[in-house]
């Protein structure tokens, strides 16, 4: 007989609990303020890019901006542009599909397994078979929501699956690959920029709990605005698992000066966690990233690579291509510890050159 936690009714209660937490998070005032900062960030970067080439810009509503230069025009909405086709977005949010496409082109990807909440045993069998830490995540979507790392057993799988299911019924579990996350940004197969993205961390003051340290960090982010971070640190299963691996909980009071890593999922990180990496990534990895973009068939994409050594090929280092993202975030390219890569400044001339020219009015 399974322990109580393994019973379907209890699993459903866990899922409902996570749904309530997410509903509360969405309605919080600080969440709305963070979203407003994100909107401001994109509005300002497109206006700056337009001004640098003498283009005009007109808000059309719903955060859509129309940018004109001579007879050419293009439209953008935050990090969505005119070259981001609906079908491309639909494909790239489907992580198992992207994994299959990359595997067909013999690119390095992590072993994975698709499942639903009714197939927990299937996911547990996969975790047992790989005999190492795994990652549970929604099979569709992005932004790091519902992703839990460090999953090692049945109880972990159940909790992580309940958390992931808040964001979609189709789930996946994959082998967790050791190493750092590198975001490679491509346009038509050419590398634009590469960023080493470290996970969020806080430095203990010797008197505050980890929960309080997270609160203080989020307060700093809200006061500083989008120049520091475009998201708040969400306390989720990944935070709890990452702390547990360090022998900590949210109630722990670490010694002064100790750096506490908060998450392995890097989507909530800040400017202080991003480092320029174009000079670190070897030619082989850059070529693999371009091949991944071509395999999926997209034009502007952010490719996430995990590797312990970016200076050698992925197959040698044991690294993988994790995801191919359309409508990639620009924030970590603009805001790094050691400089900035203004994506919109480089991208806008391309968008205008590849736009449809304004039609001339017909003469009756």
Regions found by a protein language model. Give the residues of each.
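Active-site "cap" helix and flanking loop/linker of ATP-utilizing ligase/carboxylase catalytic domains
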Residues: 207-246, 250, 340-364
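Hydrophobic faces of well-ordered beta-strands that scaffold small-molecule active sites
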Residues: 136, 171, 301-303, 322
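ATP-binding N-terminal substructure of ATP-dependent carboxylate-amine bond-forming enzymes
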Residues: 1-93, 97-100, 118-121
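Short glycine-/small-residue-rich flexible loop motifs, especially phosphate/cofactor-binding loops
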Residues: 47, 99, 124, 240, ...
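A long amphipathic alpha-helix within ATP-dependent nucleotide-binding catalytic cores
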Residues: 163, 167, 217-311
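Short aromatic/hydrophobic-glycine micro-motifs
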Residues: 54-56, 107, 132, 169, ...
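Active-site nucleotide/adenylate-binding loops and adjacent lid/helix of ATP-dependent enzymes
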Residues: 68, 74-78, 83-235, 282-287
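C-terminal active-site "lid" helix and adjoining low-complexity regulatory extension at the edge
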Residues: 270-283, 294-300, 307-364
């Amino acid at each position: 007989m399974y322990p109580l936690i393994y019973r379907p009714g209890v699993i459903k209660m866990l899922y409902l609990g996570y749904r309530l937490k997410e509903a509360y998070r969405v309605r919080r005032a600080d969440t709305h303020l963070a979203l407003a900062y994100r909107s401001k960030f994109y509005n300002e970067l497109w206006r700056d890019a337009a001004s640098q080439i003498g283009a005009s810009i007109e808000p059309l509503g719903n955060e859509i901006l129309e940018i004109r230069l001579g007879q050419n025009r293009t439209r953008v909405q935050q990090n969505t542009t005119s070259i981001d086709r609906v079908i491309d977005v639909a494909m790239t949010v489907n992580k198992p599909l992207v994994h299959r496409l990359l595997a067909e082109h013999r690119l390095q990807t992590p072993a994975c397994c698709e499942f639903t909440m009714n197939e927990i045993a299937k996911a547990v069998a996969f975790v047992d078979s790989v005999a190492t830490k795994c990652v549970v995540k929604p099979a569709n979507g992005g932004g790091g929501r519902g992703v839990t790392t460090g999953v090692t057993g049945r109880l972990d799988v159940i909790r992580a699956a309940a958390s992931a299911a808040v964001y979609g019924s189709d789930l996946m579990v994959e082998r967790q690959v050791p190493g750092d996350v590198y975001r490679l940004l491509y346009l038509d197969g050419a590398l634009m920029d590469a960023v080493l993205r470290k996970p969020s961390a806080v430095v203990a003051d010797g008197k505050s709990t980890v929960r309080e340290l997270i609160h203080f960090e989020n307060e700093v982010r809200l006061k500083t605005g989008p120049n520091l971070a475009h998201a708040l640190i969400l306390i989720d299963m990944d935070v709890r698992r990452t702390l547990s691996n360090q022998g900590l909980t949210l109630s722990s009071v670490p010694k002064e000066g100790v750096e506490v890593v908060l998450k392995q999922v890097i989507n909530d990180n800040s400017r202080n966690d991003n480092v320029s990496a174009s000079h670190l990534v070897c030619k082989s990895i850059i070529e693999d990233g371009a091949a991944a973009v071509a395999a999926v068939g997209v034009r502007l994409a952010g490719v996430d690579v995990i590797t312990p050594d970016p200076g050698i090929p992925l197959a040698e280092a044991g690294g993988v291509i994790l995801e191919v993202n359309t409508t990639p975030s620009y924030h970590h390219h603009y805001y790094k510890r050691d400089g900035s890569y203004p994506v919109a400044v480089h991208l806008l001339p391309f968008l205008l050159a590849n736009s449809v020219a304004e039609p001339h009015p017909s003469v009756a």
